[in-house]
Amino acid sequence: VWWDADEQRVLELGTFPSFMQFSKAVKLDMVCKVKTVACEWIESYGMAVGQEVFRTVAGIGWLAGTIGTEVRLVPRKAVKMHLCQSMRAKDANIRQALIDRFGVVGTKKAPGPLFGVSSHYWAALAVAVYAAETPVKDGEFWIEDLRKRSII
């Protein structure tokens, strides 16, 4: 989700089924022009995780190394607290909080500021809004900072 914090509206939505398709996409140029990319960071809840989680973490690292701009890793807990003031918030609560704040999604003939947002884009939009509205906090990381420390 490309979010314009000044105009408070979605500029673009995009899904890439693979890392290679992302790197070849025209939208990569758009991503490289932004100052910061915010990504939801994977958190441990003490449960066993599957291959999908490891692929996601690898993908975040790949993205950070590819785009050449700052990457802010945002924990989901922080997004929940910012938008819903509750750690128990679910996806439906986050979606409703975004609609309450920015207005209806709208239709093709009368698009709202969130027009086109559906499914997993709600979570991505929540991360983008959080990153645009808050300073970096403990528990969040900047990939740039890690590069400077030679961890990545």
Q: Where in this protein do the model-derived segments appear?
A:
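Phosphate- and other anionic-substrate recognition elements at nucleic-acid/protein interfaces
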Residues: 1-152
